[in-house]
A protein has these predicted regions:
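Conserved acetyl-CoA-binding loop-helix of GNAT-fold acetyltransferases
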Residues: 101-128
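Conserved GNAT acetyl-CoA-binding A-motif
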Residues: 125-148
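Short, small-residue-biased leader/transition segments that mark boundaries at the very start
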Residues: 1-2
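Extended, charge-biased low-complexity segments
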Residues: 7-60, 65, 69
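Charge-rich, solvent-exposed alpha-helical interaction surfaces
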Residues: 5, 17, 21-24, 28, ...
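Conserved active-site alpha-helix within GNAT-family acetyltransferase domains
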Residues: 140-168
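Conserved acetyl-CoA binding element of GNAT-fold acetyltransferases
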Residues: 76-79, 86-109, 139, 154
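Intrinsically disordered, low-complexity, charge-dense segments enriched in Lys/Arg
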Residues: 166-274
Length: 274
């Protein structure tokens, strides 16, 4: 392991940085490490494991890059993990499929393991106003027309994330209203106010389909989210939040892909029967 010091900062690099960073985390929690997917047949190759500690601010961050492979599948993952007092924060920078066909739902597998890790960690510590619930932050980025298409705006909406900053919601609703209008659909102010979480926009459908970049017909909610970039937040707090129950239904094992949205929408409808 390499150690370097730069004034009020110091760095540890190498695989030993993983052990160093999580040295205060109980072994039972470490065993749930989300990058270990060997039980699913995946192998993880770490390309960067770097701790940056700001000695004056008592901030410690682990910068992590890895490639995770299984047969013909290869995924490149980049994350930062921070300790803020006792709270742990995962900042998901990027997930890119480099090889293999779409449809493996690897994003769900990796995020589910991360949630499980944080939930196990929070169960062994005291949560209070000084030590808040652990979190995951993600930039749900979409760039469908880029050289390497990115569809995070829709993918992460189905993984239990809420908007990180609720002040962005009015602008998001305005874009949604304009998008629907362009496709001949009018929505009332009353109905639009029901859209409060990313999964609400992603789930919307009224029988109209539009072609995505691959020429496939998709429902309006998916078409809209495939063009959006937003910042998401997931917390161990309130495990039965609507967006989390939606994700649980959407990603349930054994459900055909074509039925996922229908199953998840049924969860949303439970809240709006009246």
């Amino acid at each position: 392991m390499l150690f370097r010091s730069f004034g009020d900062k110091c760095e540890f690099s190498g695989l030993g940085a993983l052990t160093e960073f999580f040295s205060s985390v109980p072994q039972a929690v470490q065993e749930r490490w989300p990058f270990d997917l060997s039980d699913k047949g995946y192998r993880t190759f770490y390309e960067q494991a770097l701790i940056v500690s700001e000695q004056l601010g008592f901030v410690s961050r682990l910068h992590l890059r890895a490639r995770i492979t299984k047969g013909e599948e290869t995924y490149a993952v980049s994350r930062k993990i921070c300790f803020e007092d006792d709270k742990m924060v995962f900042v998901h920078d990027s997930l890119r499929r480099e090889k293999g066909a779409a449809g493996a739902n690897f994003a769900h597998l990796l995020m589910a393991r991360t949630r499980d890790f944080l939930q196990a960690y929070d169960q062994i510590r005291k949560i209070c106003y000084k030590n808040e619930h652990s979190e995951i932050f993600v930039q749900a980025r979409s760039a469908p027309k880029g050289k390497i298409p990115v569809y995070g705006g829709y993918i992460w909406a189905n993984q239990g994330f809420d908007f990180r900053d609720k002040s962005d919601l009015p602008r998001f609703r305005d874009r949604f209203r304009s998008f629907l209008s362009a496709h001949g659909v009018k929505i009332t102010d009353k109905d639009l106010k029901r859209f409060t979480r990313p999964c609400h926009f992603a789930a919307f459908g009224c029988g109209i389909q539009v072609a995505d970049d691959n020429g496939n017909g998709v429902h309006l909610g998916k078409a809209f989210m495939l063009e959006q970039t937003w910042f998401g937040r997931w917390s161990t707090e309130n495990p039965r939040a609507e967006e989390k129950r939606y994700a649980e239904a959407y990603n349930r094992e054994g459900i055909p892909h074509a039925s996922r949205r229908r199953q998840a929408v049924a969860v949303l409808n439970e809240n709006y029967k009246n």
